[in-house]
């Protein structure tokens, strides 16, 4: 067997008859499967042991030879070779067809490859193949046209007219085969190339298509007549098994039925031919044979599918490959694994960041082989069998062994759906009682898990390498940052936030205010004994915390703080400043001086002079974690997170915050606000009845009135809220809930959406505290139901988007250090109208500069060319007033099949420079797809007549961008650069005309009357600028401008959608995806190259083809860039394995086979499919081809052997 990690590429071609015979171990002549009495395979049948191999290991059919010692002997009685039964999965048979049969893929596919080769319509082909018409093969001296069709009657008439043997005409696949044999590829290709020089329109398109197919046959060495089969391969029996069920009946694969039909019809045809039966009977049998083979290859592609019992269509060979249940997606890209378990999860608040709790029963089952090995090693049992019995009996001694075995052996936990790479992380197992897995509360956010019945799967990495990989790369404590934006993903939530919020509150005049303590212990003692409250402001000696980074002026003084904050700062990393205020200045620059007492100053005076600080909220904790990570990296951060979690839980328990109905305040002037709104609505309706406004205007005014009323109530709520109210604390701290929840409890519920998505005019005036009336309750249910259905639909949509994104970018890997390009991307802040969606500072962080950046006023060089921009550097550049910077970008990277380190920048998940081998394509796809579920589904209606366009937002807009579709509400763009000289309105046609005067001429653009204009007379516009509001169609922009403009536009559009929903995604992820959409060009004029016009090809391949021609002084080919949606881009990839496993499997394989395509296995997917180690991380060639250096003495002795081995390795590669 060839070693899978040894071969470099995989090719697919058409199989010639001789090739099929070379695979076969014998002809299947009978339709029998197994004998109903003996249950042994029948001779010469579909399960024959002579052809396919023995059914039992090392045993022939008759039982003369048993045992491995007879290996390789062919039994003289039954003719079966003594070998492993596994060969029944590998050995193929064949059927000699008594009449040629066309292969349905090549005849029926779109476009029909057979039709293009012969220049016949698929309709004509069908008539010939299914014996409805004759086709003229050789007219000899008659005036008949070759390839013309004749009906039965015309054929007889022509024979009488010209005499027998005066011309040749046939029907059936045989006729097609004769025609295909006559095709002279070289002559046809030359003729078509001539025709292309003058042809245009439909004629040209057809010629290009034919040329494409003929050229494919010519270059690949496939012969066109191989599209017609004379011999049919029979796949190995274990791939179409028959299994006995409990009731003595058999369940068999559908393929056996389909093969049986072919054999039956083939044998009947053979008999008819022997008997010299009448032509019409033979024809009918040949047609039935053709249909049987069609059904076997692709049942249902032509006519009605052949059905089994219960009128269920049978699954043919094509169906075995297609779809989610097909071979590719079900068995090759994802397999079920052993050493795995699944259970409900429960919270494990006492676990460390890198631990998870595994139930004892589960662990003993998962680690059984390891435990058994130890039992034998400790000599508790003599052999493995006895050890297994010990484990199964539940011997007391196995538990101690289990503890030893699982120490330092990480396990993987996964929660479905795995939307990004944080959905699988490694933990060290801790044995626990019970049956639920225990999960650390902080990793819940990454998994999107909660403990309301979620289940998780556990997997055990077995080999040493797998364990090392899990420990070094996947340990949960290492995954602090989210790969999508580089922000911490393990921020405390809910109780932890609430506990720390309560702990860091300040309050005036509580017991113990103004006490001074010598150190933390004294303060805690006073608190425990009731002398001081957590929130009291007290003094503490600075010298009791010598390791904190105090300023010199602050040492040896007394600092004002609270007992809670002393405890809070006690868990902080030593080198962080003492946190007194929840802001970044305190965190980065140190504690403000106003909290320190001058010698002899009265502490009470200082306390009275200070305002009360707000407590630390969720956002502040996130900032502290980010800062900690920036300074101390993972180990210290994960330890700190555990301390933060424990402190939060402890104090939220002590605080005992609860929610009762009395905690919901009553707004005193609610009735006034609502009456005023009613009054206003009445006025609006009056105005409408008098005809002063349209119905649309009235609707907008009414809904606005109610919205304002709700906002007024909300504002009143915020003004009157008590900071110590438990609901307010939960909301304010970011632990749970937001102002909208609070205002529904205490204010009013407000406007609801009707089932059609339109907002209803009647608001819900009650809140939940007062209770809703029946009608109001009924209105509420619309919204609730819509929410549920939207979520369900959105999840499926978002999942499919992720799948397409992963597919298109799976081969983008960091392949080299520096591609050496001299191009770059000029970036500035992304704005949407007036507001900034993404600042320049955010966009610069973690990127490399392309040119040096200078201070706009002083001209001082802030940072050189090709330098990494850190967070501090980015801030410095923006503070200097720089508005645009040219950076290295994925868009302009010159690396083939991937990106280089400098164009990519830092790896957001680690905060360090990205390493060669990082699969950045997959990470990008997950980063864009994972937040997809958070985006809305709706299309906003800008109500009223203000515009006739609906702005698509949320998930539909993202799909629109990535599929490069024509957007809804498309903007009109200008093709000339110049000034807007006139905008004239034409009332008769309900349009406006915009005139743009450029250097080369005047551009005239017609826009709809209702469109909102983006330009005014006198404005200067660039090519490709939008004249009206709306989305630009990217394909149109590509025609007017260059690739880079389109890439920049798409990047900005994607960011607008995500940022408007509060989701942050790193630019580089979007860049990777967009670059994949623009990596192809279409050849316009081939020049002196041997490219075909109209071909789609990779930019790099196109450049290569031109390079040689230019060097030899010829005319290079010209091309234009093509923007493809991600689905199309995935199918156009150079790897046929990746494309076939994505969508349209049969079409992709048909095309690849004709071209004799080679898959060079560059991406991740194709390597997973064939079971080769993926070329990412340490699987890259540059990491795998490291030869160990031998010692000197050995080198001298083994010199000859080494060189021979080196030669062999090189050949194998």
From Swiss-Prot:
It comes from Streptococcus pyogenes serotype M18 (strain MGAS8232). This is DNA-directed RNA polymerase subunit beta'. DNA-dependent RNA polymerase catalyzes the transcription of DNA into RNA using the four ribonucleoside triphosphates as substrates. It catalyses: RNA(n) + a ribonucleoside 5'-triphosphate = RNA(n+1) + diphosphate. The RNAP catalytic core consists of 2 alpha, 1 beta, 1 beta' and 1 omega subunit. When a sigma factor is associated with the core the holoenzyme is formed, which can initiate transcription. Keywords: DNA-directed RNA polymerase, Magnesium, Metal-binding, Nucleotidyltransferase, Transcription, Transferase, Zinc. Zn(2+) 1 binds at residues 60, 62, 75, 78. The keyword Membrane does not apply. Its EC number is 2.7.7.6. One of its GO terms (cellular component) is DNA-directed RNA polymerase complex. The keyword Nucleotide-binding does not apply. Belongs to the RNA polymerase beta' chain family.
């Amino acid at each position: 067997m060839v070693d899978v990690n040894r071969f470099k590429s995989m090719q697919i071609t058409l199989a010639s008859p001789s090739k099929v015979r070379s695979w076969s171990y014998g002809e299947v002549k009978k339709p029998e499967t197994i004998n109903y009495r003996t249950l042994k395979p029948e001779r010469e049948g579909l399960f024959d042991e002579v052809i396919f191999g023995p059914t039992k290991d090392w045993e022939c059919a008759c039982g003369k030879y048993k045992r491995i010692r007879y290996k390789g002997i062919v039994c003289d009685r039954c003719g079966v070779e003594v070998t492993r039964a596994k060969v029944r999965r590998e050995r193929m048979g064949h059927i000699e067809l008594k009449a040629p049969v066309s292969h349905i893929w090549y005849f029926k596919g779109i476009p029909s490859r057979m039709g293009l080769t012969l220049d016949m319509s698929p309709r004509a082909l069908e008539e010939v193949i299914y014996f409805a018409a004759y086709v003229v093969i050789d007219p000899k001296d008659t005036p008949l046209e070759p390839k013309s069709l004749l009906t039965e009657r015309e054929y007889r008439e022509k024979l009488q007219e010209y005499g027998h043997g005066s011309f040749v005409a046939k029907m059936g696949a045989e006729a097609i085969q004769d025609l295909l044999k006559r095709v002279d590829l070289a002559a046809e290709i030359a003729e078509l190339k001539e025709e292309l020089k003058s042809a245009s329109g439909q004629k040209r398109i057809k010629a290009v298509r034919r040329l494409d197919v003929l050229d494919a046959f010519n270059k690949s060495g496939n012969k066109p007549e191989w599209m017609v089969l004379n011999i049919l391969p029979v796949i190995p029996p274990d791939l179409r098994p028959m299994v006995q069920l409990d009731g003595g009946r058999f369940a068999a694969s559908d393929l056996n039925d389909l093969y049986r039909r072919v054999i039956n019809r083939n044998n009947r045809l053979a008999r008819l031919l022997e008997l010299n039966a009448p032509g019409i009977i033979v024809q009918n049998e040949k047609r039935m044979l053709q249909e049987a083979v069609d059904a076997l290859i692709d049942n249902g592609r032509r006519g009605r599918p052949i059905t089994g019992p219960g009128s269920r269509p049978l699954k043919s060979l094509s169906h075995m490959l297609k779809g989610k249940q097909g071979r590719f997606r079900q068995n090759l890209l994802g397999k079920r694994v052993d050493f795995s378990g699944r259970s409900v999860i429960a919270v494990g608040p006492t676990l460390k960041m890198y631990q998870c709790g595994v139930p004892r029963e589960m662990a003993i089952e998962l680690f059984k082989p390891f435990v058994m090995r130890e039992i034998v090693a400790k000599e508790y049992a003599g052999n493995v069998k006895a050890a297994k019995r010990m484990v199964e009996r539940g011997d007391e001694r196995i538990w101690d062994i289990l503890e030893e075995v699982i120490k330092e052996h990480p396990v993987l936990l996964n929660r479905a759906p795995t939307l990004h790479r944080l959905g699988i992380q490694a933990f060290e197992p801790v044995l626990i009682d019970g049956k639920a897995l225990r999960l650390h509360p902080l990793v819940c956010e990454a998994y999107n898990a909660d403990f309301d019945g979620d289940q998780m799967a556990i997997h055990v990495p077995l080999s040493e390498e797998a364990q090392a990989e899990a420990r070094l790369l996947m340990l949960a404590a290492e995954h602090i940052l989210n790969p999508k934006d580089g922000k911490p993903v393990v921020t405390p939530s809910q109780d932890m936030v609430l506990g720390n919020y309560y702990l860091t509150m300040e309050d005036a005049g509580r017991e113990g205010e103004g006490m001074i303590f010598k150190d933390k212990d004294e303060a805690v003692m006073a608190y425990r004994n009731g002398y001081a409250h957590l929130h009291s402001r007290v003094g503490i000696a600075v010298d009791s915390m010598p390791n904190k980074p105090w300023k010199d002026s602050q040492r040896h003084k007394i600092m004002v703080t609270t007992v809670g904050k002393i405890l809070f700062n006690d868990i902080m990393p030593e080198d962080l400043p003492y946190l007194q205020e929840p802001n970044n200045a305190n965190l980065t620059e140190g504690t403000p001086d106003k909290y320190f007492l001058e010698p002899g100053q009265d502490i009470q005076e200082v306390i009275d002079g200070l305002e009360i600080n707000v407590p630390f909220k969720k956002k502040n904790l996130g900032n502290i974690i980010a800062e900690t990570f920036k300074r101390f990296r993972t180990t210290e951060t994960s330890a700190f997170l555990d301390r933060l979690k424990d402190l939060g839980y402890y104090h939220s328990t002590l605080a005992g915050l609860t929610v009762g109905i009395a905690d919901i305040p009553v707004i005193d002037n609610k009735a006034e606000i609502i009456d005023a709104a009613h009054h206003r609505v009445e006025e609006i309706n009056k105005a409408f009845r008098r005809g002063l406004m349209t119905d649309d205007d009235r609707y907008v005014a009414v809904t606005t009135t109610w919205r304002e009323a709700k906002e007024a109530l909300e504002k009143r709520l915020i003004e009157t809220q008590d900071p110590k109210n438990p609901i307010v604390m939960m909301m304010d701290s970011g632990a749970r809930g937001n102002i909208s929840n609070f205002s529904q409890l205490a204010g009013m519920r407000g406007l609801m959406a009707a089932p059609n998505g339109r907002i209803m005019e009647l608001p819900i005036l009650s809140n939940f505290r007062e209770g809703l009336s029946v009608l109001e309750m009924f209105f509420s249910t619309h919204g609730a139901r819509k929410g549920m259905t939207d979520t369900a639909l959105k999840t499926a949509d978002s999942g499919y988007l992720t799948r397409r994104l992963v597919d298109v970018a799976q081969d983008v890997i960091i392949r080299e250090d520096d591609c050496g390009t001299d191009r770059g991307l000029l970036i500035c802040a992304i704005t949407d109208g007036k507001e900034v969606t993404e600042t320049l500072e955010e966009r610069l962080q973690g990127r490399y500069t392309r040119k040096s950046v200078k201070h706009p006023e002083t001209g001082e060089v802030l940072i050189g060319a090709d330098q990494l921009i850190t967070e501090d550097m980015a801030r410095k550049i923006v503070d200097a007033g720089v508005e645009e910077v040219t950076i290295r970008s994925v868009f302009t990277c010159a690396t083939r099949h991937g990106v280089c380190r400098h164009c990519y920048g830092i790896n957001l998940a680690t905060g360090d420079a990205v390493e060669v081998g990082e699969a950045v394509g997959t990470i990008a796809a997950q980063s864009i797809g994972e937040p997809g579920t958070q985006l809305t589904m709706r299309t906003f209606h800008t109500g009223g007549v203000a515009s006739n366009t609906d702005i698509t937002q949320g998930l539909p807009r993202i799909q629109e961008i990535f599929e490069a579709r024509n957007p809804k509400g498309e903007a009109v763009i200008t093709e000339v650069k110049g000034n807007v000289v006139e905008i004239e309105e034409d009332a008769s046609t309900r349009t406006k005309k915009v005139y743009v005067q450029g250097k080369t001429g005047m551009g005239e653009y017609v826009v709809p009357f209702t469109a909102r204009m983006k330009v005014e007379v006198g404005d200067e516009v660039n090519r490709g600028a939008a004249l009206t509001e709306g989305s630009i169609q990217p394909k149109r922009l590509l025609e007017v401008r260059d690739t880079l403009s389109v890439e920049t536009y798409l990047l900005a559009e994607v960011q607008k959608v995500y940022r408007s929903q509060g989701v942050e995604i790193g630019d580089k992820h979007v860049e990777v995806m967009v670059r994949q959409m623009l990596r192809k060009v279409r050849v316009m004029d081939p020049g002196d190259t041997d490219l075909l016009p109209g071909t789609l090809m990779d930019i790099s391949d196109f450049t290569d083809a031109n390079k040689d021609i230019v060097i030899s002084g010829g005319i290079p080919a010209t091309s234009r860039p093509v923007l493809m949606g991600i689905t199309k881009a995935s199918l156009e990839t150079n790897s046929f394995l990746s494309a076939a496993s994505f969508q349209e499997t049969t079409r992709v394989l048909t095309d690849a086979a004709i071209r004799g395509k080679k898959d060079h296995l560059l991406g991740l997917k194709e390597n997973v499919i064939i079971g080769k180690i993926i070329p990412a991380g340490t699987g890259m060639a540059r990491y795998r081809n490291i030869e160990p250096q031998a010692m000197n003495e050995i080198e001298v002795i083994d010199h000859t052997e080494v060189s021979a081995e080196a030669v062999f390795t090189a050949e194998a590669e």
